[in-house]
Regions:
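NAD-dependent ADP-ribosyltransferases
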Residues: 1-162
Length: 162
């Protein structure tokens, strides 16, 4: 990240109405943030007791992770050193789970029929914001370098029924 202090003192909005994907609630709810994982990854997360950055979870260098097909967003190498979070009611995490399942971006039909939801790890934004490695990049609500211990920060885990 080029300028980590740029967004350091940005206040959390109560709701983000510009988001058109969250029609039911009229925008992104900001009291919670979420990390979404496919079931097999969620099992590993629970066994480990922490959400780990990609370099820590997969034990591969950031340059290798950046070149993988699953890194379709052309993310910079520092991306792989952070645990990423979306707003609590955002579908972005489930979209990523489906993208990894299909090997491509899912259509709107695939996000309803045949949809495979991820396991959602919820955190209170204001608590996670106090994590010593939490930063704001102006794109994601929050991201945390290296690791988030579930025992210290998790608020709720939602596992889909099927």
């Amino acid at each position: 990240m080029l300028n980590p202090d740029k967004y350091k003192n940005v206040r959390r909005p109560e709701i983000i109405r510009e988001c058109t994907a969250c029609k039911t609630r009229g925008g992104c709810m900001t009291d919670l943030v979420c990390h979404t994982a496919p079931l097999e990854n969620a099992i590993s997360i629970l066994k480990c007791g922490s959400l780990l950055s990609a370099v820590n979870a997969r034990k591969l260098p950031d340059t290798v992770l950046q070149k993988e097909d699953r890194s379709a967003a052309n993310d910079p190498t520092d991306f792989f050193h952070y645990v990423m979070f979306s707003w609590g009611n955002c579908q972005a995490g489930d979209r990523l789970v489906m993208e990894r399942k299909l090997g491509r971006s899912p259509s709107s039909d695939e996000m309803s029929a045949g949809f495979t939801p991820g396991v959602r790890f919820y955190f209170k934004y204001d608590d996670l914001d106090k994590h010593p490695q939490a930063i704001h990049d102006g794109f994601l609500p929050i991201k945390v370098k290296d690791e988030v211990k579930l025992a210290d920060y998790v608020y709720m885990i939602v596992v889909p029924f099927e």
